[in-house]
Amino acid sequence: MFMGEFQHNIDSKGRLIVPARFREGLGDRFIVTKGLDNCLFVYPQHEWAEVEQKLKSLPFTRADARAFVRFFFSGATECEVDKQGRILLPNNLREYAKLDKETVVVGVSTRVEIWSKEEWDRYNAQAEASFEQLAENIVDLL
């Protein structure tokens, strides 16, 4: 399980340090793709396989399903951790998530998310302001 929040900088070559706490669960090779809320989703290979199976079961006759699957898979790339614990994030993913220098790497149960610090701070402030309401809304889902 992934949890916690870590701040790291992207270097001039587009490399990001993967927090040591997450490296063991992610393995040496894992998938990074466009996520929701302008962040990147990072999946270990076994979790990616499960997500892939679920998305493959969506009806391709529905335009919204096709659009989501296209968006999700077209942004996906396999990353490999180098000896310094870094990954190279492709330019298209850095642009999508507005990653420039300061980032926040967040553990979210079965995946990791990579956020620009500015976007994370904005998102987190909104979530904190409505946390009680969010809890009330999802209690029925549990």
Curated annotation (Swiss-Prot):
Isomerase is among the record's keywords: no
GO MF annotations, alphabetized: DNA-binding transcription factor activity; transcription cis-regulatory region binding
Compartmental location: Cytoplasm, Nucleoid
Pfam families to which the protein is assigned, alphabetical: MraZ
GO CC annotation: cytoplasm; nucleoid
Keywords, alphabetical: Cytoplasm, DNA-binding, Repeat, Transcription, Transcription regulation
Xref: SUPFAM superfamilies: AbrB/MazE/MraZ-like
PROSITE patterns, per the entry: SPOVT_ABRB
Domain SpoVT-AbrB: 5-47, 76-119
Any GO BP annotation: negative regulation of DNA-templated transcription initiation
Record bears the keyword Transcription: yes
HAMAP family: MraZ
Family the UniProt entry places it in: Belongs to the MraZ family.
Quaternary structure and interacting proteins, as annotated: Forms oligomers.
Name recorded for this polypeptide: Transcriptional regulator MraZ
